[in-house]
């Protein structure tokens, strides 16, 4: 079995195990365009319980390239076409406004291409204001960004399905290491505040994402990302999806790392849910720590650190974002 076929089989098996809807035709189209990319970049399989606890399955990859190859491949393969909406030109504007060190793409296996990521070096959030087609609500939240220390921009995405955009921030400020910070920022948007136990997990969050769209003046969602270096460190008792995926998720490593996104929004926008990615090749979690200038808690837990030093930097720059 080739590595591409193994990945495809693992993806379908995850969908079946979690009861996630999928389309063989959609998966075929995704793998025809991007299958080879999944074999040698930061690749992850994700499950998330966003639709009334129904689990969805996504796959994503990131690659250290200055140009956005995903946009070209998606257009050529029929996964992306114009919608008569600002999302049509937004990713190109992002790459023109802010130099990139990497890009990425995210796919729903029952839908197709969902997002394309733009990954620069960490830059001031003001750099994003130069992007012409961003929703006006982004600029309108300058005071919000200042108040909550969301000033170090580390990634942007275009969501083609939901017609929205995400800004990702490096959580570098001491206040972001407190539970009160997460209570305050969620309450500021009238989003649900999680349990004290989850709040204690969030204080170790290196990355905060904020979602905006063109149809609303407010913030659509917020998500806080945490990384875990192996199956045992995932807080499996918090949610059955976390437990099942941490124990069963396939990977080329015996004991892979995981990224967990704790996502919050108003009830009308799917409320609160969890998303968890398995680091299939052992590149995603080290890249995540590297991107945020953090030491990997257990270096030996991921094979990337066994590579020759000249390869390690290249591999760490194959960043995968949420």
UniProtKB/Swiss-Prot annotation:
Keywords of the record: Prenyltransferase, Transferase
Residues forming coiled coils: none
Catalytic activity: hapalindole G + dimethylallyl diphosphate = ambiguine A + diphosphate; hapalindole U + dimethylallyl diphosphate + H(+) = ambiguine H + diphosphate
EC top class, as a word: transferase
Description of activity control: Activity is slightly increased in the presence of Mg(2+).
A molecular function (GO) term: prenyltransferase activity
Annotated effect of mutating residue 117 to Y: Retains 94% of activity with hapalindole U as substrate and 74% with hapalindole A
Binding positions for dimethylallyl diphosphate per the UniProt entry: 46, 60, 115, 166, 168, 221, 225, 275
EC number assigned by the record: 2.5.1.159
Keyword Transferase found: yes
Sequence similarity: Belongs to the aromatic prenyltransferase family.
Summary of the function given for this chain in its UniProt record: Prenyltransferase involved in the biosynthesis of ambiguines, a family of hapalindole-type alkaloids. Catalyzes the reverse prenylation of hapalindole G or U at the C2 position with dimethylallyl diphosphate (DMAPP) to generate ambiguine A or H, respectively. In addition, accepts hapalindole A, an epimer of hapalindole G, and catalyzes normal prenylation at its C2 position.
Entry comment, domain topic: Hapalindole A and hapalindole U are fixed in the same hydrophobic binding pocket, but they adopt completely different orientations, which define reverse or normal prenylation.
Protein's name in the database: Hapalindole dimethylallyltransferase
Organism: Fischerella ambigua (strain UTEX 1903)
Lineage: Bacteria, Bacillati, Cyanobacteriota, Cyanophyceae, Nostocales
Gene that specifies this protein: ambP3
């Amino acid at each position: 079995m080739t590595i591409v076929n193994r990945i495809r089989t693992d993806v379908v098996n995850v969908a079946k195990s979690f009861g996630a809807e999928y389309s063989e035709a959609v998966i075929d189209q995704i793998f025809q365009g991007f299958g080879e990319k999944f074999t040698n970049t930061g690749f992850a399989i994700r499950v998330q319980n966003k639709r009334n606890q129904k689990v969805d399955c996504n796959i994503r990859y990131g690659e250290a390239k200055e140009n956005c190859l995903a946009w070209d491949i998606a257009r050529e393969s029929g996964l992306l076409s114009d919608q008569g909406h600002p999302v049509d030109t937004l990713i190109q504007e992002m790459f023109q406004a802010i130099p990139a060190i990497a890009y990425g793409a995210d796919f729903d296996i029952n839908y197709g291409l969902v997002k394309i990521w733009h990954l620069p070096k960490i830059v001031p959030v003001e750099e994003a204001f130069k992007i012409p087609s961003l929703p006006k609500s982004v600029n309108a939240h300058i005071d919000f960004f200042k108040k909550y220390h969301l000033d170090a921009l580390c990634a942007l995405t275009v969501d083609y399905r939901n017609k929205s955009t995400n800004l990702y921030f490096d959580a570098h400020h001491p206040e972001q290491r407190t539970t009160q910070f997460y209570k305050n920022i969620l309450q500021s948007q009238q989003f649900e505040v999680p349990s004290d136990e989850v709040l204690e997990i969030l204080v170790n969050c290196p990355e905060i994402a904020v979602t905006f769209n063109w149809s609303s003046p407010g913030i659509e969602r917020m998500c806080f990302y945490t990384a875990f270096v192996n199956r045992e460190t995932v807080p499996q008792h918090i949610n059955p999806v976390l437990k099942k995926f941490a124990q069963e998720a396939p990977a080329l490593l015996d004991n892979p790392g995981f990224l967990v996104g704790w996502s919050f929004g108003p009830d009308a926008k799917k409320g609160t849910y969890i998303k968890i990615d398995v680091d299939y090749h052992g590149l995603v979690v080290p890249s995540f720590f590297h991107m945020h200038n953090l030491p990997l808690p257990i270096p030996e837990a991921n094979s990337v650190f066994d590579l020759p030093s000249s390869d390690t930097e290249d591999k760490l720059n194959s960043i995968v974002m949420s």
